[in-house]
Amino acid sequence: NNPLIFEIDLGFAVDLGVVTIERARVRLRFDPLGPPELTAFAAGIDIPGALRGRGYLEMNESEIKGQIDLTIVPVQVRIAAGVGVANINENGRKATGVIVSLEVEFPVAIPLGNSGLGIYGFLGLFAMHYSRKEPPPSAMAPALAWLKDIAQGNPTDIAAWSPKIDTWAFGVGAVLGTMGSSVIFNLKGVVMLELPGPRLLLMMRANLLAVLPKLKGTAEGTFLAVIDLDMGRGTLTIGLSVEFGIQPLLEIHIPVEAFFNFHDSKDWHLYLGRFIEQIHAKILEVFDGSGYLMLSGKGFAAGDLADGLPVPVNGFAISTGLHVSFVWGSKSVGLYAEVAAGVDAVLGFDPFRLTGVLYLRGTLHVFIIDLSAWAKLTVDIGEKPDGSKVASISGQICGRVKFLFFSIE
């Protein structure tokens, strides 16, 4: 009863003059045998001095959707629109899903008083029997993970939505930017209402570009932010992701998450980085540092903390960590020295327990010879969940000489 289908997705650039074909997806049915089917198509258009843009169309047995992005060259007005229609059958229930998105950008901003900012465009979205695609499990807040990984920073991208009965969404937003400034800053923000729930979301993506003549480089930053108020569940989630760099000097990544449950006063947390996704900075390919600070009203479970720290930790708890490393030389050549140090700790109050792990590691690599030494210190003071007391300090010091074919430790 299983059909035999062969599908090929081609990406190319066939220039036909005004029109450029960019993509085509063809499906062939062998059992039962059927004619070829075009299931996806993308093309661009460029009429000099008049119009340029691109669009795509996808279709299958139950859904057809596409987007188009055009710029009217004489007036420099950009218009982007997307439409999707789906026939949905879920557990015997049938419905027709519709999603529509629209975005308009102007060449000249509408000034916002004396703020130095202006409105460069507007955007909107309507979705009936459509919902946001579920992002894969990650360390980020779900709505922020969707905005970053699925929607690629654009909430009105209909490719980030999928058909689902009894879900609705309404969104309006604007595009803001600087006016007459050497620092280029633009922000795309959307206020979205989702049903059932109701659920109110504020999603923002901001880009920053500043030219630094003295450093002969540029400072670039991308900021993603989500405020998710789920009135049905009684929760508030705030997520922030910052990527900032000054090439070739500095790279910084900062994740932040806050969560509050209005039905349970102990169910809250504030994460300035997490052990599994830390605040990270790199300077000149020489210094590498990361760290985190986690506060939780309900403690921590397995997977939340560094290796060597006890879990679970109940009640209000704090966990923090800092890790740094320096590299001199070239790892690609095989001649370098590296020093690394770090500490991870957790403090719980129900019952009281303080545990910390400190390590120091050094390596000298000279082509085929590798000299390494490391030390580790663990401190554990307080009371275990079973009521037994603990007060211990333990350490370990090791060294190793590694040659091309053997090592001594």
Where are these regions (language model features)?
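Extended assembly/interaction regions that build large supramolecular complexes
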Residues: N1-E409
